């Protein structure tokens, strides 16, 4: 079952199920995709020398993240091995290609085109709607640092959400101070990933944790990439 706070967040956020691009935009994207992407990813996105862009694995990789993550990846890295002499692709054309990819994955078109402003406000979700982030995702959560049976954990943690950076910015930590705590507990692994961090000095503090989520029955953990104090003591 989707946690209540996460459900409220997604109910307030447009998703790719809501018709966030137009049919005309996807049609333009199809022509651009055929020219620039089809030779590697296949005419029907089935994958040839490069991975498929229209299957469950593709959706699993990108779901529960804002769509600008996929857009930025395509814009900055594709076509792979592009020659400096090859024809340039504009940001708008990259957006069109992404909308075609969405259409081929069965997501509905709407009446309004996707723009550079809107792409970061749309959540990429699976066909069954919002779900907890998948195993192995780089995530961020906020919780209380404590020790249980000799293991460091963050308790009263928020539902983890995807993040793109392994490190925390000052703005993120400041924003975390305003966020309410949750009900989850995660074991922390790889504390040495935070040089100079001494957990004993932050026991009972509200912390922002980033790392790779490992889902295990009754014992979920986060392989740490960064940990920052939000406030002391840890209060809701």
Question: What is each of the regions a protein language model found here?
Answer:
Residues 29-43, 97, 101:
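The canonical Cys-X-X-Cys-His
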Residues 12-32, 127-135:
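Electrostatic cytochrome c docking/interface patches
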Residues 181-183, 193-209:
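Short nucleic-acid-contacting surface segments enriched for D/E, G, S/T with interspersed K/R
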Residues 83-148, 229-236:
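Flexible coil segments in periplasmic/lumen-exposed cytochrome c-class electron-transfer proteins
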Residues 212-236:
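OB-fold/S1-family single-stranded nucleic acid-binding modules
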Residues 148-159:
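Short aromatic-glycine-enriched beta-strand elements
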